[in-house]
Regions:
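Structural signature of outer-membrane beta-barrel domains
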Residues: 1, 41-47, 99-103, 150-156, ...
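Early exported N-terminus immediately downstream of N-terminal targeting peptides
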Residues: 29-49
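Residues on the lipid-exposed face of transmembrane beta-strands in outer-membrane beta-barrel proteins
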Residues: 18-26, 38-42, 77-83, 94-100, ...
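Residues that define the transmembrane beta-barrel architecture of outer-membrane proteins
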Residues: 10-18, 30-32, 71-75, 130-134, ...
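Short loop/turn motifs that connect adjacent beta-strands in outer-membrane beta-barrel proteins
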Residues: 25-34, 85-90
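Extracellular/periplasm-exposed beta-strand and loop segments of Gram-negative cell-envelope proteins
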Residues: 2-13, 43-72, 101-114, 118-137
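Membrane-proximal helix-loop-helix units in multi-pass membrane proteins
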Residues: 83-111
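Predominantly the C-terminal beta-signal and adjacent terminal strand-loop region
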Residues: 122-178
Length: 178
């Protein structure tokens, strides 16, 4: 599958995103609030076929590559706009975020034929994985529960070295504690 950027998208088995966001909200009107904040997030993508393609490293053809993970650990800043619908019962958040990835690694686990020992290759080459990410998030919430959609504007890979790009759009459920 080809992305709008023209770069192939790696086959993603699954992924997860864990985030802790601290924000200070202000409510100047009954229908509107805004805030600023900071966050820590961890993202993991379980990939399939990237290592076998030889983009990261040339593996022997007979190597059994059974796990591939792309891991990011980020700290970032946020600007949040909140629109209250039906009083405080339902709200829509529009959030801009900017991240710096202090952890950027690609892990590959494989076994050579005739061996019972698995090998882990961990690539932390900063020139391959870009440290800055930015995007927008929209979430609809009631009480502490929110459904969100997040779009990342920036690339995760240096496309001159790794011509791939993971999904830019993600969706999920968030819990907010006040």
């Amino acid at each position: 599958m080809i992305y709008k950027t023209g770069y192939p998208r790696p086959s993603t088995d699954y992924g997860f995103d864990f985030e802790v966001l601290f924000k200070q909200m202000f409510k100047p009107a009954s229908w509107y609030g805004f805030g600023v904040g900071g966050h820590f997030s961890a993202q993991t993508y379980s990939l399939h076929g990237v290592a076998a393609s030889g983009i990261i490293k040339q593996y022997p053809e007979n190597a059994d590559i059974y796990k591939e993970f792309l891991n990011y650990g980020n700290i970032g800043i946020d600007i949040v706009n909140r629109f209250y619908l039906y009083g405080d019962a339902l709200y829509l958040d529009l959030r801009l975020f900017g991240d710096w990835a202090f952890i950027r690694e690609f892990d590959v686990k494989y076994v050579m034929p005739g061996s019972a020992v698995s090998t882990l290759d961990r690539f932390k080459d900063g020139s391959r994985f870009l440290p800055f990410q930015a995007g927008v998030e929209a979430s609809l919430g009631s009480g502490s529960l929110q459904i969100y959609f997040r779009y990342r504007f920036t690339n995760m890979f240096n496309h001159s070295l790794i011509p791939l790009e993971p999904e830019r759009l993600s969706a999920g459920i968030k819990l907010e504690f006040n």
